[in-house]
Amino acid sequence: MNCAFCPHHKCYTEGRNCTKYSHEEVCGFYSEDDRRMMRASSATESRNYMKMTRLEESAFFAKELGVKKIGIAFCIGLANEAHFCAQYFKNQGFVVESVCCKVCSVDKDMLELEKIKPGKHEAMCNPRTQAQLLNSAGTELNFIVGLCVGHDMQFTMASKAPVSCLITKDRVLANNPAGAVYSRYWR
């Protein structure tokens, strides 16, 4: 598939199916839990389209699913943003668990990781432990706030709860990676 290079996107505009899968086969890809999540996602989109921020939509979505406990895995560089998000979710009635990327303060030397400043203690980002702690806390839905590229993947793979991203880190573009796509200077 090369949908990114399709000039027409008739799947969206005309109901065209460009794959080998029948509609029945596609529906079979979704378990009942998947369908429940799809219903909550569809309700979030249809009732709040162009009305809510991603943070607000995330709380709405969690309520639609009946979630009570939310986890936040965040980068130390976005600690203030994580605090704001955690407080927002608490104000919406959720129990919130949050874990910083530097949890346990394991030096990068322990895993033979490259350091920004060699010769000094530099705590590694610890996405698998972030996931383990949130798994142990029994979170039902986890959100990423600014985890590094690769660490976000490690966290997602290790999390027992479904994961979504609230804020994507981009150190150069003020955490707005889409800015590179919108700017002619990056093309």
Q: Language model features by range: what are they?
A:
Residues 53, 122-136, 147-149:
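Active-site glycine-rich loop that binds ribose-phosphate moieties when present
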Residues 64-71, 133-139:
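Short, surface-exposed connector motifs at secondary-structure boundaries
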Residues 70, 96, 163:
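Hydrophobic anchor at the start of a short beta-strand
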Residues 81, 85-132:
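Long, charge-dense
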Residues 81-88, 152-161:
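Short Gly/Thr/Asp-enriched flexible loops that form oxyanion-binding sites at enzyme active sites
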Residues 160-187:
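Short, flexible loop segments at boundaries between secondary-structure elements
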